[in-house]
Amino acid sequence: AVTQLTQAPSNLSWSPDGSQIAFSMFTPKSKPAPVSLPGKPEGANWTEAPKYVDKDNYRFDGGGYAKDGHQQIYVMPATGGSPRQLTDDEFNHGGQLAWSPDSKHIFFSANRRDDAFRQPVNSEIYRLTLSSKEISAVTDRNGPDSSPKVSPDGEKIAFTGYDDTKMSFQASNLYVMDLDGSDV
């Protein structure tokens, strides 16, 4: 193993120069309770502590309570070592990761809206700059944009998605655009 992780990594992606591996991983993040509870008296036999819920999607059918945390993006040296966390937001950053040919940017799909739970299929393609951890949207469409892939010359991005018309089924299309999000 090139590193020891506390959670399972997914969406592995080698940098074009071969020096780094990017991946996403669930990262737990506990939130403090809004009130402090009294301490347990000596000898008391209490049940487990109450769960503090502050989000709409806190429980899954058959899966119990959702863990606090989100899928975050990491990068680490391909030779091994400690991963460096690149995202730390209240959004899931899972899905395919695509490197720019110069290994300076990673493109990914995510729903980073405040109302993401109410608009689950409204994702965009984002560019993450490794040196600054700056994230900028490349697409801004109504519907899911996913699976970004940068062209070998670094000029274009291919991705899949559709314009959401709120139908029960919509087929995804293949799109190609300039690296800055123009000319879709």
Residue ranges and their predicted role:
Residues 69, 82, 121, 134, ...:
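Residue-level signal for beta-strand positions within conserved beta-sheet cores that form or flank
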Residues 26-74, 109, 119-124:
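Predominantly five- to eight-bladed beta-propeller fold
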Residues 29-31, 77-78, 166-167:
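Proline-centered turn/helix-capping motifs that create local helix->coil transitions or kinks
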